[in-house]
Amino acid sequence: MKRSLDYIKNIFVIVCISFFGSLHSETNTIVYVKKSEKTLTVTKAGKTILKIPISLGFEPEGPKKEEGDGKTPEGTYTIDYQIPEWDYYKALHISYPNKTQLEEAKKRNVKAGSGILIHGMKRHWNWFGHLHTYLNWTHGCMAVTNEEMDLLFEMVPVGSKIRIEP
């Protein structure tokens, strides 16, 4: 019985920390992506703290409509978790697709896509530095250098909003 109560208390504490932590970060840190400028800007309390060049999906114009279209989504999402180690160094996961996008894809009998990230470079590609931004090469993600990914990991807490604009 005591174990069950301890378990319930631990779950309650985790839920409270997650809820109140995301409320705090939502109002403080916002990531803005301007696809037309190929830039990612991080603001905290309304002040720009980082602006960096990015690569986008290989067909960047227009909103993402289905899996495999090479488009980077447009809209407002949440950074819902961090990936500390991955094929492309580190990554921040974006809450794409939302309910509306899932419904629209279902109507067209296609998959909306998933796995949209802000990520670094494969370790053996990192020497490219910002040269990677001359091409849009991802499948819909936003790519930055590994050094920039380290900064984003520090600056952008889980629960932060991300606004991706055309």
What are these regions (language model features)?
Residues 2-12:
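Bacterial N-terminal signal peptides that target proteins for export
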Residues 25-67, 166:
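Intrinsically disordered, low-complexity
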Residues 37-39, 76, 115:
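Structural motif
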Residues 83-166:
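Exported/periplasmic cell-wall-interacting domains
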